[in-house]
A protein has these predicted regions:
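Bacterial N-terminal signal peptides
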Residues: 7-17
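Positively charged n-region of N-terminal signal peptides that target proteins for export
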Residues: 1-4
Length: 388
């Protein structure tokens, strides 16, 4: 038994490392000349371009039937409970299990980092994060904590019924979180996801507004696991590759393979961060725009898709104190929101493309899901003028 545990532990290290090495060889969408929108990106073109935001991953894979993980997004380097950031949640389609949603909507703030994982591990991940938070200095008297945990269902590539996420996986994601470049593709909560019938995963992007619009940064991170009719910068990639939703029903060619009809169930978690001083009300408005970016990629928010957006602001002037009494906060006016809306749409769209471009093919749980074929995709993008 001890030998088996040691082998599984070794595989859990070697397999994610091998997948990460393959992913590093694949380009991001901007690397091949696809420029989404008009706003410039931040230094890393990642959610971590918003100062203070950190991301950590734990990938859990045994090479046989387990293919899942945890992704942690920390809003700032301090204690998320003691120094709360304003936040909002928008639900595009509510077929999902986002834990902690009602209190965020009621109070408009985060009390914990944000975790993403697989559907049946939401509660295990939340429990582990609560234990981790309660052990932090200054938390000795805390008796209520609103853990915010999102999910998508990776039950095709992952034996989800085994609920493989353990406390040490969650702690590792939280404690390994860093700023700088963010690993994308088959990693963390994106290890077992599928998007548009190809391997999905984690993707991220950012936008920086010009000084005339405030100079603020918006960053987005997604966990893509949904269906639809893939478009990239307007090019009908899914249709051209013959793999898209409703292909069997409305296909133009009698030779279409029924297996190419992309299943409509699935979900996406979208996390939006900004350093603009926004109230939770305007953060909710910002979150709605992420769904517009999602729709640009070919999603139609199917019946079985859980499409959720969590948005928060890291600006010092909007931090919420745990002490009583009146407080004064900065609040960007409604009239200054439009540039942030555009930035959110663009960064969400590009994040989804990056999740597909960086993902590699995976075989697990008796199933193989191929990565988006890059050469064929690039040829389609050139033909439709999507590459600049």
């Amino acid at each position: 038994m001890r030998v088996r545990v040691l082998i599984l532990s070794l595989l859990s290290v070697l397999i994610p490392a091998a997948l990460a090495a393959q992913s590093s060889e694949r380009p991001r969408v901007r690397d091949v000349g696809v420029v989404v929108g008009v706003m410039p990106t931040g230094e890393h073109n990642a959610i971590t371009d918003v100062a203070g935001v950190r991301v950590g991953h734990t990938t859990v894979s045994d090479g046989a039937s387990i293919q899942t993980g945890v992704t942690a997004i920390l809003p700032h380097p301090g204690n998320a409970y003691m120094s709360r950031v304003p936040a909002a949640i928008h639900v595009g389609n509510g077929y999902g299990k986002l834990l902690g949603v009602t209190q965020v909507r009621e109070l408009g703030e985060l009390e914990t980092p944000i975790l993403l994982t697989c559907t049946l591990c939401v509660w295990k991940a939340a429990d582990a994060m609560v234990e981790w938070m309660l052990e932090q200095r200054g938390m000795e008297q805390v008796r209520s904590l609103n853990a915010l945990v999102g999910e998508t269902n990776d039950g095709g590539l992952n034996d989800i019924r085994s609920r493989p996420i353990e406390p040490h996986h969650v702690v590792a994601a939280l404690e390994s979180a860093t700023d700088g470049p963010v690993e994308e593709g088959v990693v963390g909560a994106g290890a077992g996801t599928v998007a548009f019938g190809w391997k999905g995963g984690i993707g991220t992007s950012s936008r920086v507004l010009p000084q005339s619009l405030g100079g603020y940064t918006v960053g987005v991170l997604v966990q893509s696991n949904f269906g639809g009719i893939l478009q990239i910068a307007g090019a009908p990639v899914g249709v051209e590759l013959g793999q898209y939703a409703f292909a069997q029903q409305v296909g133009r060619d009698e030779d279409y393979d029924p297996q190419a009809d992309v299943q409509e169930w699935g979900s996406i978690m979208m996390v939006v961060a900004t350093d603009a001083p926004l109230s939770d009300r305007n953060l909710e408005r910002l979150a709605r725009r992420a769904v517009m970016g999602l729709s640009r990629t070919g999603s139609y928010a199917s019946n079985g898709s859980g499409d959720y957006v969590i948005a928060f602001s890291t600006a010092n002037g909007v931090r919420r104190s745990t002490t009583g009494g009146p407080h004064t906060y900065d609040d960007l006016s409604n009239g200054n929101m439009s540039g942030l809306f555009e930035a959110t749409i663009e960064a969400t769209e590009e994040s989804i493309y990056n999740s597909l471009f960086k993902a590699v093919s995976v075989t697990s749980n008796g199933r193989t899901v191929d990565a988006l074929p890059l050469e064929e995709t690039l040829e389609i993008l050139r033909r439709y003028g999507a590459i600049r």
